[in-house]
From Swiss-Prot:
<keyword id="KW-0687">Ribonucleoprotein</keyword>
<dbReference type="InterPro" id="IPR019981">
    <property type="entry name" value="Ribosomal_uS11_bac-type"/>
</dbReference>
<dbReference type="InterPro" id="IPR036967">
    <property type="entry name" value="Ribosomal_uS11_sf"/>
</dbReference>
<dbReference type="GO" id="GO:0006412">
    <property type="term" value="P:translation"/>
</dbReference>
<dbReference type="InterPro" id="IPR018102">
    <property type="entry name" value="Ribosomal_uS11_CS"/>
</dbReference>
<keyword id="KW-0694">RNA-binding</keyword>
<dbReference type="InterPro" id="IPR001971">
    <property type="entry name" value="Ribosomal_uS11"/>
</dbReference>
<comment type="similarity">
    <text>Belongs to the universal ribosomal protein uS11 family.</text>
</comment>
<comment type="subunit">
    <text>Part of the 30S ribosomal subunit. Interacts with proteins S7 and S18. Binds to IF-3.</text>
</comment>
<dbReference type="GO" id="GO:0005840">
    <property type="term" value="C:ribosome"/>
</dbReference>
<protein>
    <recommendedName>
        <fullName>Small ribosomal subunit protein uS11</fullName>
    </recommendedName>
</protein>
<dbReference type="Pfam" id="PF00411">
    <property type="entry name" value="Ribosomal_S11"/>
</dbReference>
<keyword id="KW-0699">rRNA-binding</keyword>
<dbReference type="GO" id="GO:0003735">
    <property type="term" value="F:structural constituent of ribosome"/>
</dbReference>
<comment type="function">
    <text>Located on the platform of the 30S subunit, it bridges several disparate RNA helices of the 16S rRNA. Forms part of the Shine-Dalgarno cleft in the 70S ribosome.</text>
</comment>
<dbReference type="GO" id="GO:1990904">
    <property type="term" value="C:ribonucleoprotein complex"/>
</dbReference>
<dbReference type="GO" id="GO:0019843">
    <property type="term" value="F:rRNA binding"/>
</dbReference>
């Protein structure tokens, strides 16, 4: 078990621009906010926000995770965000909307989901 030591001091740097990487899978949504060089400033996920099981894959869980990551990024002084969205999950748009609602100026949204140019054979279709 991790012990609760002294609180982490967040040094307010002169970082005004950042990148929000949103990885939205079918099971979870992970949000990482970095500076322009790619150094992670804050992160949150639906699972780390207290959602378990099928509730992790909901848009509301992605919204809560984005609010947590955005609140920490605000302490660093970030105002403008580029958003890079990866994956087909249900939390894609709600995470972007909640970052916008926190007061970040979203400069652009880029979909970086990898698409094969007829590469590997996909897994077989599910029969439910």
């Amino acid at each position: 078990m991790a012990t609760t030591g002294r609180p982490v001091k967040r040094v307010k740097r002169d970082i005004s621009d950042g990148i929000a990487h949103i990885s939205a899978s079918f099971n979870n949504t992970i949000i990482t906010i970095t500076d322009r060089k790619g150094n992670a400033l804050s992160w949150a996920s639906a699972g780390a926000s207290g959602f378990r099981g099928s509730r992790k894959s909901t848009p509301f869980a992605a919204q809560v995770a984005a609010e947590k990551a955005g609140a920490v990024a605000k302490e660093y002084g970030i105002k403008n965000l580029d958003v890079h969205v990866t994956g087909p999950g249900p939390g894609r748009e709600s995470a972007v909307r909640s970052l916008n609602a926190l007061g970040f100026k979203i400069v652009n949204v880029v979909d970086t989901t990898p698409l094969p140019h007829n590469g590997c054979r996909p897994p077989k279709k599910r029969r439910v």
